[in-house]
Regions:
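Binuclear metal-ion centers of metallo-dependent hydrolases, dominated by the metallo-beta-lactamase
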Residues: 68, 80-97, 176, 180-235
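Zn-dependent metallo-beta-lactamase
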Residues: 1-19, 26-29, 101-103, 204-212, ...
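Short active-site oxyanion
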Residues: 1, 63-68, 134-136
Length: 235
C-alpha cells in the first residue's frame, strides 16, 4: 500500500495497482500547483465530507477516469445528478471492493458537512482501509473523540492519516492523543499549511511525536510512503 500526498487532505493510495483517491482538492491549492490533475490515477474516489476543500476536483477527475465514488448517501446523490456513479455507505458499515480484496469501513468523524452552496452534505466520516490485514485509518476532518479508542479493539492500524492544522480540526496535540487512542505509531499529517490559519511548526510537531515514541510523517506534496517500509513497532 503506497500513499502519495497530493496536498491539503488529499492522498492517493495505490493498492496493487488500484488507486483510491481521497478528498481531491488540488487545482485550487497553490501549494499543489506542480501537480497535474490530468495525470492522477483514480479507480475510486473516497469523499469524507462535502466541504469545498475536500471535493473541488471530484467531478473533473471522476469524469476523466470513470472512478467510482465511495461516500455517504447524500454526497453520492449530489454527484449522481451530475452523471457520476459510486457506492454509498453510512457510519459503521463496511463493504468489500476490488473483487473482495479491499475492505473499507466508514467510521465516525466529529465535524460538519455541507456543500459550498450550503446544502446538506450528510454525516462527516472517516475510513478504515483493510488490505491483507494492513490497515490505514483515514480520520477525515475531525475533532479528537473518545470513540477512537474502540478502533484498536478490532483493528491493528499500520498508518493513521490525521488532520493536524488546528482551528478547523485537531491540532498536533490532539492528533498525538488520537494516535494513543488508536494505538498507532505512524501518523501521516494532513490538513495543515494550506491556509494561514492552519500553518504549523513542522519540526516542533515531529518532535512532539518523537518524544512519545511515535513518528509523524510530513511529506512534500507529490511524495510517497509505502507501508512495507514503515517500522510498525515502537519507534
Amino acid at each position: 500500500m503506497k500513499v502519495t500526498y497530493l496536498g491539503h487532505a488529499c492522498v492517493n493510495i495505490d493498492i496493487d495497482g488500484t488507486h483510491f483517491l481521497v478528498d481531491p482538492f488540488i487545482s485550487p491549492n497553490p501549494l499543489a500547483s506542480h501537480i497535474d490533475i490530468n495525470s492522477i490515477k483514480a479507480d475510486y474516489i473516497l469523499i469524507t465530507h462535502a466541504h469545498g476543500d475536500h471535493i473541488a476536483d471530484v467531478g473533473a477527475i471522476a469524469k476523466r477516469t470513470g472512478a467510482q465514488l465511495i461516500t455517504n448517501p447524500e454526497i453520492l446523490a449530489h454527484y449522481e445528478k451530475l452523471g457520476l456513479t459510486g457506492h454509498a455507505m453510512n457510519l459503521g458499515g463496511s463493504h468489500r471492493f476490488v473483487d473482495g480484496k479491499v475492505k473499507i469501513k466508514m467510521i465516525k468523524a466529529e465535524h460538519s458537512s455541507s456543500f459550498p452552496d450550503g446544502s446538506y452534505g450528510g454525516n462527516p466520516a472517516g475510513f478504515l482501509i483493510d488490505y491483507n490485514d494492513d490497515i490505514i485509518y483515514i480520520s477525515g476532518d475531525t475533532a479528537l473523540h473518545y470513540d477512537m479508542k474502540i478502533i484498536p479493539h478490532q483493528y491493528k492500524v499500520n498508518l493513521a492519516i490525521f488532520p493536524i492544522g488546528n482551528n478547523y480540526t485537531m491540532g498536533v496535540r490532539d492528533a498525538l492523543t488520537a494516535a494513543r487512542f488508536v494505538e498507532v505509531n505512524n501518523v501521516l499529517g494532513v490538513h495543515y499549511d494550506t491556509f494561514p490559519v492552519i500553518k504549523i511548526d513542522k519540526e516542533a510537531a515531529k518532535r512532539k511525536f518523537k518524544d512519545d515514541h511515535r513518528r509523524l510523517h510530513l511529506l512534500e506534496i507529490g511524495a510517497s510512503l509505502d507501508l512495507k517500509d514503515l517500522n510498525i513497532s515502537t519507534l
